Structure formats: C-alpha cells, structure tokens
Regions:
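Non-cysteine beta-strand/loop elements that form the S-adenosyl-L-methionine
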Residues: 1, 23-27, 97-100
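Glycine-rich, proline-tolerant flexible connector loops at the mouths of alpha/beta enzymes
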Residues: 1-16, 101, 106
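Residues at alpha-helix caps and immediate loop-helix transition turns in enzyme cores, especially N-
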Residues: 7, 157-160, 189-190
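Short hydrophobic interaction/assembly module
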Residues: 8-37
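Active-site acidic/histidine proton-transfer and metal-coordination neighborhood
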Residues: 17, 33-178, 185
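A short alpha/beta connector and helix-capping loop motif
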Residues: 186-197
C-alpha cells in the first residue's frame, strides 16, 4: 500500500460501492512474528517477503520492518479516505492499526519447568527492544498501535497488559484493541480490563 500507486484509492472505491466505512486496519499476522519464537507454522500466515528463508531472527527483523511500513500505509490509507469518511460516525478520530505482537515467553506461561522472574523480565525486554522502534515509526506517521490482548501475545491478561505498557515506557502510540471474548475464555474480568486501561 505504501508504494503501490492507486491501491488505497481502489480500496476506498470498494468501500464506497458498498456504503462501508473504515476506522482501523489490521496487522495481526505480521505483528505476530515480531516477537514470536518462529517455527514452520508461521510460514503459512506471513507474506513470502517477510518469511524469506525462514531463519527465525531474520523473520522477526523483517516483520519489524514491515510493521514500521504499516504505519506509513495506514497514514496514506486514512488520508486518502478523509473526504469519504467525513459523513460517517467519527469513532475515536485517531488513525489506528490493530494487531498482535507475538511473545518470546508465552510458551512458558504454565511455569513448568519453573520460570524465573528474570526469564519473564527478559521476555518483556525483548518486546520493548523490538517494538520500541515500531512505535517510533508509528509516532512519525501519527498512527496508534492497538494490541489485541490475546493468548500467545506479550499481553494476554491484566497483569501482562500492565507490564507491556511499562516495557514500552507508556509510549503514547501503544494501547489496546478491546476484544472481550479472549479475556472471557481465560477467565479474565473483561469489565475490570476496561476500567484498568
């Protein structure tokens, strides 16, 4: 979308044809690969240019670069649709990309074999190291990233959501996409989540 001439305009034309609007875009699948422990399962959810040769660290680095480009694509897309969206409900008034982050520590959630606090700290530090530059790219494009709190992500409940915020030092471009179904399935109080965040 960033470099393809006419692409975003064609999407807006399709939306207009069906009298639809758009208030956020999604980058869940590429986002999943930014912090995940990459294995062969990721190949089927990633574009070929992000998967590359499948080397796990290379996949993560390409996913991070693609997420930074996503901010530019979102800016271009929503700027192209301003006139059309003028008569639609306003929503938040912000440009938002919803998505996933993956997690280098999710697989250890059950804590057996025993998981030390240092292990958890390293996982949140990995998230901050990888996602910090992505959030800076989002800031440069005046776009917000909304993590869908979900199993397999760095934030999957109230405590991990708070730690994710702390890991990125409360970055103004980082927030949450609220989907109570995933919280409910885990027995997390989804009303408390809204009040907390």
């Amino acid at each position: 979308a960033v470099n393809e001439k006419g692409y975003v305009e064609s999407v807006w034309e399709l939306l207009k044809k069906h009298d639809l609007g758009c208030w956020a875009i999604s980058s869940h699948l590429v986002g999943q690969a930014t912090c995940d422990n990459i294995d062969e399962r990721h190949q089927c959810i990633l574009p070929a240019h992000v998967w590359g040769d499948g080397n796990p660290e290379g996949v993560r680095q390409r996913a991070c670069a693609e997420m930074a480009l996503t901010a530019q694509a979102a800016r271009k897309f929503f700027d192209a649709g301003k006139a059309y969206m003028a008569d639609k409900p306003k929503g938040s008034g912000k440009t938002v990309v919803n998505g996933f982050t993956g997690s280098s520590i999710w697989h250890s959630i059950y804590a057996f074999p025993p998981t030390s606090q240092a292990y958890w700290d390293a996982g949140f530090a990995d998230f901050a190291r990888r996602f910090g530059p992505i959030l800076e790219a989002f800031d440069k494009s005046n776009v917000n990233f909304a993590l869908e709190v979900h199993p397999t992500e760095i934030a999957f409940d109230l405590a991990s959501a708070q730690r994710a915020i702390e890991a990125v030092k409360g970055h103004k471009r980082f927030g949450f996409n609220y989907d109570p179904s995933h919280l409910g399935y885990q027995g997390v109080d989804y009303v408390k989540f809204i009040r907390a965040f």
